[in-house]
Amino acid sequence: MSQNYYQILGVSKTASQADLKKAYLKLAKQYHPDTTDAKDAEKKFKEINAAYDVLKDEQKRAAYDRLGHDAFQNQQSRGGGGNHGGFHPDINDIFGDFFSDFMGGSRRSSRPTSAKVRGSDLKYNLTINLEEAFHGIEKNISFSSAVKCDTCHGSGSEKGETVTTCDACSGVGATRMQQGFFTIEQACHKCQGNGHIIKNPCKKCHGMGRYHKQRNLSVNIPAGVENGTRIRHTGEGEAGIRGGNSGDLYVDITIKPHDIYKVDGANLHCKLPISFVNAALGGEIEVPVIEGGKVNLTIPAGTQNGDQLRLRSKGMSKMRSTIRGDMLTHIHVEVPKNLSKRQRELLEEFKKESINEKENDGSFFNKMKSLWS
């Protein structure tokens, strides 16, 4: 017993039109003779088309369900149900999605194509120092790129020569070939898909409308740029082919590590060495800042090693903003290794008078334990 139309498409009798179409497209792609070498592909493909031709039509489907498979076919053979044997799917409606997937892209437009091709984007890695990132800077860079031909002005044709429309494809850039139910498009062999013919190509660019050379360009790096920032320079990439638009240039910023500062977003961190005397007594010391020069930093009396002191608005600038980050100083208390006789005497006297240096009472051990908390 032969399969009925529902079985051929692999759907139930209650399948919706959307389910029918989905099943049909899947099977049509699988069994189309151009996509498989299976011996029975052509036969299966005809069965699939015949089944879908009936089931996609609500009136035919109702008759098919009422009469059954064999009776419906007998009626069709007597001419009672129309001529579905010559069924030709609407290529734009039924197979639009199929062609998009199977042919690797969307269907081509019937409008003439342009021979102009946009140029490629370029990437340039630029390394700057932290001060340059803070202030902003103009940098001159050099790179190899395709540039618009100054002889033919990008047309690809010798000066005074005209570009003619391809007579093989009428300027479309593609030719069509009918294969059964399908219309296949391919690039025109005469114009290579350009849509026009350059009879006398420019000798300097060999008809491409561009050639390669070393370029020099001044690029602006804004103040507050961060490591890893990508800056786009529109139209500074490679020139297009035969007058097409130029691509873009992307400058990727790398900031070199600094000898003093570590960057944390807009904040700067630095280690600040101070004497144990300044740590104990407090005072003011000068510290360098990223914009140049120095500022005074107040050291509170009793400052401990590892304490962090903040200088507000002395960090990095922010792009397109007047707000700055902070500078955070991490205190490193230095203990002198070489003492003069007088310094030693004073420290010995301080030691005797200190009541917090008694190592035998409980307070010393409590301090030791607190260092772990």
UniProtKB/Swiss-Prot annotation:
Q: Where is the J domain?
A: 4-68
**Ranges occupied by CXXCXGXG motif repeats:** 149-156, 166-173, 188-195, 202-209
Cell compartment(s), UniProt: Cytoplasm
The cofactor(s) it depends on are: Zn(2+)
> Any idea which UniProt keywords this protein has?
Chaperone, Cytoplasm, DNA replication, Metal-binding, Repeat, Stress response, Zinc, Zinc-finger
Molecular-function GO term, any one: zinc ion binding
Which of this chain's residues are annotated to bind Zn(2+) 2? 166, 169, 188, 191
Source organism's superkingdom? Bacteria
Query: Which Gene3D superfamilies does the entry link to?
Result: DnaJ domain, Heat shock protein DnaJ, cysteine-rich domain, Urease metallochaperone UreE, N-terminal domain
List ligand-binding residues for Zn(2+) 1: 149, 152, 202, 205
Would the keyword Cytoplasm be found if you checked this record's keyword annotation? yes
Q: Which SUPFAM superfamilies match?
A: Chaperone J-domain, DnaJ/Hsp40 cysteine-rich domain, HSP40/DnaJ peptide-binding domain
Question: Does this entry carry the keyword Cell membrane?
Answer: no
Task: List the residue ranges forming a coiled coil, or say none.
Answer: none
Q: Name one Pfam family in it.
A: DnaJ_CXXCXGXG
- Similarity comment: family membership: Belongs to the DnaJ family.
Complex formation:
Homodimer.
Question: Per its UniProt record, what NCBIfam families does this chain match?
Answer: DnaJ_bact, PRK10767.1, PRK14300.1
Q: What is known of its domains?
A: The J domain is necessary and sufficient to stimulate DnaK ATPase activity. Zinc center 1 plays an important role in the autonomous, DnaK-independent chaperone activity of DnaJ. Zinc center 2 is essential for interaction with DnaK and for DnaJ activity.
Please describe what this protein does. Participates actively in the response to hyperosmotic and heat shock by preventing the aggregation of stress-denatured proteins and by disaggregating proteins, also in an autonomous, DnaK-independent fashion. Unfolded proteins bind initially to DnaJ; upon interaction with the DnaJ-bound protein, DnaK hydrolyzes its bound ATP, resulting in the formation of a stable complex. GrpE releases ADP from DnaK; ATP binding to DnaK triggers the release of the substrate protein, thus completing the reaction cycle.
What is the protein's given name? Chaperone protein DnaJ
- What organism does the UniProt record list as the source? Rickettsia africae (strain ESF-5)
Name of the coding gene:
dnaJ
